[in-house]
UniProtKB/Swiss-Prot annotation:
Monomer. Its EC number is 2.7.1.171, 2.7.1.172. This is Fructosamine-3-kinase. ATP binds at E89, H90, L91. Disruption phenotype: Mice are viable and healthy and show normal blood glucose and serum fructosamine levels. They however display increased protein glycation levels in cells such as erythrocytes and pancreatic islets. Increased levels of protein glycation levels do not affect the maintenance and function of pancreatic islets. One of its GO terms (biological process) is epithelial cell differentiation. The gene is Fn3k.
Length: 309
């Protein structure tokens, strides 16, 4: 692999440093190169290129806002024996602590970014002498993303939809439940789902949802800080409801209260927030069930029952 990296990165220097690491899905290695330190993720699954290309597109979208700090993505490279590697900027990070409040503010700004773009675009169109065309981005009007992304190793369809409940039900919940049906044929899950899915539109009654660019997998293992401030990484981005982002952040710990306080100063909770948060947590429990097995069956069904009360 090192010979491949030297050739693809056009570097004479390739010296490993630090300890190898990674998460549940991929291995991780750090190297010094002629152009500076890089972090290399390695995955030998057949769909590794698709997974890494989705992550690269997500990092680029987040980075282009100028509102949050992410590692600069560099290159996805196929491995000769199957799988792929993803090369990105190496950042010397530590666990999120003193920068939690700042990250809350930055995530709120990120979630408001597309709305502000759309408002600017409308203003330009309504101004005499200003056409709709121009170099400035116009803002996104639908829910989805321009490419497949993976939350963990599961590919997510991001086909554009006009309304959020349709997108979320079809491309997030139903997609996860189809995998559970295939692998477990769990009758109780299907019975609860048949009752729940007809109630989902009611949870969104009376609220306006503007597509927001999301990180898509904002748990504590995907956030950190360094000397310059907060850092987020390992995204599975798409344009969705801003509240979706907070579900996994509130599930497994690691985010101080200051994060949520700072966030909600900029984006207050809308009516029905708590019940929708449960709905978004359901997606994450189902995704964990599909990744890690039946230990996540009980919390998945528990959330479904709560939503049916």
């Amino acid at each position: 692999m090192e010979q491949l990296l030297r050739a693809q990165l056009h570097t004479t220097t390739l010296r490993a440093f630090g300890s190898s690491g990674g998460g549940c899905i991929s291995e991780g290695y750090a190297y010094y190169t002629d152009s500076g330190p890089v972090f290399v993720k390695v995955n030998r699954r057949t769909q590794a290129r698709q997974m890494f290309e989705g992550e690269m597109a997500s990092l680029e979208a987040l980075r282009n806002t100028g509102l949050v700090r992410v590692p600069k993505p560099m290159k996805v490279i196929d491995l000769p024996g199957g799988g792929a590697v993803f090369v990105m900027e190496h950042l010397k990070m530590k666990s999120l602590s003193s920068q939690a409040s700042k990250l809350g503010e930055q995530m709120a700004d990120l979630h408001l970014y597309n709305q502000k773009l759309r408002e600017k675009s409308k203003t330009r169109q309504n101004t005499v002498g200003c056409g709709a065309e121009g170099a400035e981005p116009q803002g996104v009007t639908k829910f989805g993303f321009h490419t497949v992304t993976c939350c963990g190793f599961i590919p997510q369809v991001n086909e554009w939809q006009e309304d959020w409940p349709t997108f979320f039900t079809r491309h997030r919940l139903q997609a996860q439940l189809d995998l559970i049906e295939k692998d477990y044929a769990d009758r109780e899950t299907q019975e609860l789902w048949s009752r729940l899915q007809v109630k989902i539109p009611d949870l969104f009654a009376g609220i306006e949802i503007v597509p927001a660019l999301l990180h898509g997998d904002l748990w504590s293992g995907n956030v950190a800080e360094d000397d310059q401030g907060p850092v987020i990484y390992d995204p599975a981005s798409f344009y969705g409801h801003s509240e979706f982002e907070l579900a996994i952040a509130s599930m497994f710990g690691g985010f101080p209260r200051s994060f949520f306080t700072a966030y909600h100063r900029k984006i207050p909770k809308a009516p029905g927030f708590d019940k929708r948060l449960l709905l978004y947590q359901l997606f994450n429990y189902l995704n964990h069930w599909n990744h890690f097995g039946r230990e996540y069956r009980s919390p998945s069904l528990g959330v479904m029952r709560k939503l049916l009360r």
